[in-house]
Amino acid sequence: MGIKRQSETLTYSAQTVGGKDVNDIKSINMINSLQGKSAGLQITPNSTGAGGSSKILFRGNKSISGSNQPLIVIDGVPTMTNTATSQVASDYGGERDAGDVMSTINPDDIASITLLKGAAASALYGAVAANGAIMITTKQGMAGKVKVNVSSNTTMEVPMILPEFQDTYGAGADGTFSWGDKLSKASKNYAESFFRTGFTTNNTVSLSGGSENFKGYFSYGNVFSHGMTPENTYRSHNLNTKVDFKVLNNVYVDFSAKYSTQYSKNQAAAGYLWNPLTGVYLAPRGIDWDYYKDNYEVYDPARGCNVQNWTNTELQQFGNPYWMLNRQTPISKRNRYEFGGSIKWDITADLNIQGRMRYERGEEQFIHNAYASSVGNLYKMGRMKNNRYFSDQLYGDVLINYNHTWNDWGLTATAGSSFTKTKTAHVDLWGEGEQYKSPGDGNIYYPNIFTPNNFYGNLSKLGKGDAMETEKRLNAVFATAQVAFKEAVFLDLSARNDWSSALAFTDGCSFFYPSVGASVLLNKLVPMGEQVNLFKFRGSYSIVGNDVPIYMSNQRYTLKESGVISAPDEAPFRTLKPEKTHSIEVGFDGTFFNNRLDFSLTYYKTNTKNQFFSVSAPYESGLRNRYVNAGNVQNQGIEASIGWHQQFNPDFSWSTNFNISYNENKIKELVEGLENGLTIASWQGAKVVLNEGGSYGDLYVRQIKRDEAGKPVKNDKGEPILMGDNVDEMKYAGNMNAKVNFGWTNTFHYKDFTFSFLIDGKFGGRVLSATEATLDGWGVSKRSGIARNAGKVVVDGVEFDPQAWYTTTGSSNFNNSYATEFYVYKGTNVRLREMSLGYTFRNLFGNGKNLTAALIARNLFFFYKDAPCDPDVSMGTGNGVQGVDVFNLPSATSLGLNLKLNF
């Protein structure tokens, strides 16, 4: 909010990291560079590669139906999270990942990042910050001569982990599954042949300078990436300008403008459909891989066009990967514009008033045309898809700030008002069908012509066009005050009231929430000696609302392309109340031995109430669902960090920091009438189910039938018998969220050399791999090959034929569920996340003109893991889908060089 305070006066936990933490070893999505560097911060990258989004979580999942992502604040102003929703998490496959705001930020523009993990810390930002806030401060011009900084970060990427395949048994008679006879020679490893060495370069040039009355900052950055998947490219460009004026002695004006553009081609998409990895991993062993690579299409005289060439072109989840990359290529183009400004008037030395405004616009075009014969024969004449997404946000606020001291007393106060106006829109163009012969018989004139004019009736009779606009407004008033005594005791009070248009048709469209906090610097009240620099206790209590989605409180009718108005199937939620998170936090901060040792410890407990649920409506209402407010999700845990800096001599120093967090989640209440709990995510034979007394992320899996002695039971064919996939027949397999996360950073300086590394990990949680289940079901896994060599699979003393076992317990068809109990793994893992070795060439190009060169590496190796995939990568950023592997793009090990030049 533009409010500045000394860290030692804060009554809540807040951690600030420098810009070097995200730009020394860069990630294309800069938030991923913070993995393992802060207690209580969990970052899960999506499995879509460059330009993809990431799930960010502070202190556990709180909202069942709403968002759990924190607010992103840039230079004090809340920002839009993304252009549109990110990739839909489904085992069938999500076609797009719209990215997030973090992927549009140039890490070289960042001066610092402050992590506000608790509700008390972010209460002034209102409902949008119910899950905490990430405050990013960007660089600005400094008075003095113009300074130029140039940086270039170049890395090469290779897959960190690949599945293990058998190379002994080939295809059966259908040319699909690898349950055939032994091969005369070992099969090629198609995955090793398919993936290439990726290449990414990230470059920035910036200029800053000015005088006392005018300061300016300008930067240009770009990213060029050729992914590990063939034909995958990503590029982005960023422009950033900030200027500050001193108009009068007491009037200050600043203006900023930013523009970013992103282009991605063949971005990875987890799931079965639209994913080249299904063909790479499932291709029958022993085929001529190079033949299908060079001849991925053949001419079909009946359709008059080239069609897919593959061992079996009828299966939708199984295609030639090179056809997918060249003939059903997803292309995404994104633009983001941002303009902002502020004016501040220092009325007196103690009193000022400021006004700020920022406008943001996001645009995306997503093109995913599929040539004839794509996805089996689902699109016999091809499919056209051209979607456009738009979002706008206008934010403004006015704040009055007062700061004064009287002898031992001090008062800092802020009061203000803000408004946020958000609009979204999307226009979808989609067409597919059969070859046109006459009116009423077919609708596509020519295959693979992706224009509306190629469709009979210009798509109007297909009903495939779609358009939607939304608008939301949020107005607020707020105030905060801090009273200080002897610069040692601090009391914070804050309050905010929001008016949300999403609640317009309810009894009350506003909601109020307060917070209170206190901190005591005991070292300033009681003599503790020179070795104690800070000895601080703090505590806070807050209530923060979480706004609700639009159009829940009013019936919404839909106008179809044909002119027909369709009635809603959900009852309006006229008694809707926003979620509210009640949070308590206590902690200790200390620094000792001339600030060489620092220690921080925090305990927190949150209860998020008034959750909103969709439940079945009474039959006589004629509606399908209705909404209710209910539920209480509790999170409580501990965060701790300890750091030490040792200066051994003028040339040699060592700095180390260790952080660890523990979070325990508990569902205290749910809506009545849910006998089998609430399912928030499901896959083939696996469900994430919430139950009272359980935890957010509880995983239930399908199991095989066993006798009273616990031994597997066979059917007449000698196959294991699957139990049902209703929750009451499923098996609890654990919780998908780790309770403990940690990170350990070390930095050594010797003269002009710098060496650093980061080890991080987590303990607990579960990972579900549909990839491994499918490899087993198709007979291509190393595990299935070993079993066939042995001639049997032995499970708890019962022998099975390998094919009978794996085609039943594994996945041989993505429409069928399987025994997921055998494909759940421990999420515990410890890895060497980052490492860097650099040298600074001082005064290389003149006095003060230095060059720093560093060898950098990321995701080098695991010290320990149980899962066959990277446990920290997920197929989506939605609720309940972390830790799921459905042919996800492998994580990358990157090695490279980082250069920085200043003059």
Language-model segments: which ranges?
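Outer-membrane beta-barrel signature, preferentially recognizing the C-terminal barrel domain
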Residues: 326-328, 456-476, 558-600, 626-649, ...
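Flexible loop and strand-edge segments within Gram-negative outer membrane beta-barrel domains
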Residues: 154, 158-161, 183-190, 200-221, ...
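Extracytoplasmic gating/loop element in the C-terminal half of outer-membrane beta-barrel translocons
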Residues: 191, 466, 500, 762-852, ...
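Small-side-chain secondary-structure face that scaffolds active or pore-lining regions
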Residues: 227-238, 246, 258-272, 328-436, ...
